[in-house]
Amino acid sequence: MPAATVDHSQRICEVWACNLDEEMKKIRQVIRKYNYVAMDTEFPGVVARPIGEFRSNADYQYQLLRCNVDLLKIIQLGLTFMNEQGEYPPGTSTWQFNFKFNLTEDMYAQDSIELLTTSGIQFKKHEEEGIETQYFAELLMTSGVVLCEGVKWLSFHSGYDFGYLIKILTNSNLPEEELDFFEILRLFFPVIYDVKYLMKSCKNLKGGLQEVAEQLELERIGPQHQAGSDSLLTGMAFFKMREMFFEDHIDDAKYCGHLYGLGSGSSYVQNGTGNAYEEEANKQS
């Protein structure tokens, strides 16, 4: 089977507070053989912009991310597990974690909530049956999925995604300085490939995740704008791109650990665009 070929028997497992322990036990087994983890999150948009003076546009972009991640709560996390060949485990390949979120009490951008509601996210169920992030963090820390150099993380334009995960795992606000953020990032996620960053070296590939998937002739499983389906599509895109553009080998020195839109590798930093993360927050569209 070619890498990342769609197999419709693959299932996305919905995880709520009631089945979290059971599903994390399965993940602790799966990660032993399927050490590529494609990840996506859903979060409630962008609600704030930093004020004051900034050393550079790069500094502004990170402060924009930081102030929004600090203020807001994650809604969903999708994790898809694959092996070196891009193959899935038998049965469930993707776990979609649904976190506690209250539309009455928690902050959000209205347009983001409308998009997620249209996409099938059940906010009433998130309020009543959602996972507590602190307990999830305890389970994730001992799962073998984070803090492990043998695990390779796959993502798409993922500054916000990793920002929310670091906030959960440290149970604290993000560090004030971007360099400190990347130090923590490397601790929890030693190997990261951001598909959007890889696209810089892929002739004619452009756009958001859905557009890229269509260019690569990949077929989505599950609903768009939900973290499980998006993580699965991200993993499929990585392996298809690795085969088509990188001769099945990614140069770690050039690509590992770079997040598109953050740090010195950011095209936004270089061209001075001020709304990098507004775009990222709407990257699902």
Curated annotation (Swiss-Prot):
Tell me which cofactor or cofactors this protein depends on. Answer: Mn(2+); Mg(2+); Co(2+)
Pfam families on file = CAF1
Chief site of localization: nucleus
Reaction catalysed by this chain? Answer: Exonucleolytic cleavage of poly(A) to 5'-AMP
Please tell me which top-level EC class this enzyme sits in: hydrolase
Which cellular component terms (GO) are annotated to the entry? Answer: CCR4-NOT complex; CCR4-NOT core complex; cytoplasm; cytosol; intracellular membraneless organelle; membrane; nuclear body; nuclear speck
List the SUPFAM superfamilies: Ribonuclease H-like
Q: Cite the binding residues for a divalent metal cation 1.
A: D40, D161, E278
Spell out the InterPro entries in the cross-references.
CNOT7/CNOT8/Pop2, RNase_CAF1, RNaseH-like_sf, RNaseH_sf
For the biological process aspect of GO, one term held by this record is:
defense response to virus
State its location(s): Nucleus; Cytoplasm, P-body; Cytoplasm, Cytoplasmic ribonucleoprotein granule
Q: How is the cofactor bound?
A: Binds 2 divalent metal cations per subunit with RNAase activity being higher in presence of Mn(2+) than of Mg(2+) or Co(2+).
Indicate the family of this protein: Belongs to the CAF1 family.
Q: What protein name does the entry list?
A: CCR4-NOT transcription complex subunit 7
Organism equals: Homo sapiens (Human)
List the gene name: CNOT7
